[in-house]
């Protein structure tokens, strides 16, 4: 491992190593799974390295989760996947005393069961029978509480409902300057509690998941301030219904009907067809940080898309922050590059920036692509910045491709 005293020292060392166009090649990794690598030109003489995995039947995809977060290559080593990429947004803070029970932000469905109920409208990547699709998921639906049907809605929406969901996407992350690292992500501890209740109509109820997939009410607060991070699901509901031990079952989330057909889902976005990314609601989503997520700056980008011929693709456009020659791609450049590859049926951005990583099995060995500049920040035991090109940032969700 190579250690540095400062990020600028690391940048000077890494530039001649990493700022190089990749040699173009195309490799069949397994039946139905192909990896293509190429350096693509950008304006001003810059370039971006493109790594695209394309798959068709009989290959299958799976959405997977990790708690605690681990790196993409570590996840791949523990699985039989041919390709592993990082997935969707997750709770990420450099300084926090507590964290949510489910790290994947907003919507998370795991093994056909709800892990996190969305509190805001957001696109989702959904896995049905080994195939991925992009679905617009408004945060509302139907549930049963104490054997009675109710309409629910996310607490960050304006949807009319009988009860309102709170969850990990109510958290607030602030980006603040840091003399050592440049910036730090600070979790605002007060944001893990529900808002105050000032009338006798509502109560907040905390639920825990049970093995059969339903939720059981384990706590109640009539004045609000219920700790969302200590529960799998929190609902603000009519006080007459708020009783410990009550059974809750979620039936629908937007257009998604819960059942065995939906194996997994994670919040992602925005979709590649969104008309004006500068006005997308994710820019104001404080669970992702106080810096606008979709600012038009170059960065490493990871996207999923499906072309009209039925093929599915994962594309990582790689760069190194601060490089003039190898800066990564802007949002507009990413969309244009994807559209240049053929008629697009659907697509979305995944968690991009420093998180994006692809791990590939080739000839029995594991190779990784993307974000090879990644530095592990100083900790209590080590004050150095440690270069971890193969590992990268740990993540809480992954897309895994299997040959059948």
Regions found by a protein language model. Give the residues of each.
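Gly/Ser/Thr/Pro-rich low-complexity, intrinsically disordered segments
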Residues: 1-404
């Amino acid at each position: 491992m190579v250690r540095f005293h400062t990020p600028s020292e690391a940048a000077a060392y890494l530039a001649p190593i990493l700022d190089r166009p990749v040699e173009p090649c195309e490799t069949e990794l397994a039946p139905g799974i192909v990896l293509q690598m190429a350096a693509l030109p950008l304006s001003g003489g810059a370039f971006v390295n493109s790594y695209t995995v394309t798959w068709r039947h009989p290959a299958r995809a799976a959405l997977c989760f990790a708690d605690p977060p681990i790196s993409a290559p570590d996840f791949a080593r523990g699985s039989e996947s041919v390709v592993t990429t990082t997935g969707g947004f997750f709770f990420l803070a450099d300084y926090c005393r507590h964290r949510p029970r489910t790290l994947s932000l907003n919507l998370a469905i795991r093994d056909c069961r709800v892990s996190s109920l969305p509190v805001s409208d957001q696109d989702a990547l959904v896995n049905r029978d080994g195939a991925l699709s992009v679905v617009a998921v408004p945060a509302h639906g139907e549930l049963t509480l104490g054997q009675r049907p109710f309409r629910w809605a996310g607490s960050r929406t304006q949807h009319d409902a009988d009860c309102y969901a709170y969850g990990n996407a109510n958290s607030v992350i602030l980006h603040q300057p840091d003399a050592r690292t440049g910036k730090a992500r600070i979790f605002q501890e007060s944001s893990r509690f529900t808002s105050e209740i000032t009338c006798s109509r509502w109560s907040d109820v905390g639920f825990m998941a049970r093995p059969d997939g339903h939720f059981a009410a384990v706590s109640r607060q009539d004045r609000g301030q219920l700790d969302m991070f200590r529960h799998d699901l929190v609902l603000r509901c009519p006080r007459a219904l708020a009783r410990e031990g009550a059974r809750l079952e979620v039936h629908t989330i937007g257009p998604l009907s819960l059942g065995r057909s939906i194996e997994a889902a994670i919040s992602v976005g925005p979709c590649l067809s969104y008309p004006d990314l500068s006005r997308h609601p994710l820019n104001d989503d404080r669970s992702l940080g106080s810096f606008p997520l979709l600012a038009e700056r170059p960065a490493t980008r990871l996207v999923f898309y499906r072309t009209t011929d039925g093929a599915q693709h994962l594309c990582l456009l790689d760069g190194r922050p601060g490089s003039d020659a190898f800066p990564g791609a802007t949002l507009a450049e990413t969309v244009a590059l994807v559209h240049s590859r053929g008629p697009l049926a659907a697509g979305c951005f995944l968690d991009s920036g420093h998180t994006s990583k692809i791990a590939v099995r080739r000839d029995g060995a594991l190779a990784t692509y993307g974000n090879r500049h990644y530095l592990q920040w100083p900790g209590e035991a080590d004050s150095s910045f440690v270069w971890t090109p193969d590992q990268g940032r740990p993540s809480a969700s992954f897309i895994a491709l299997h040959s059948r």
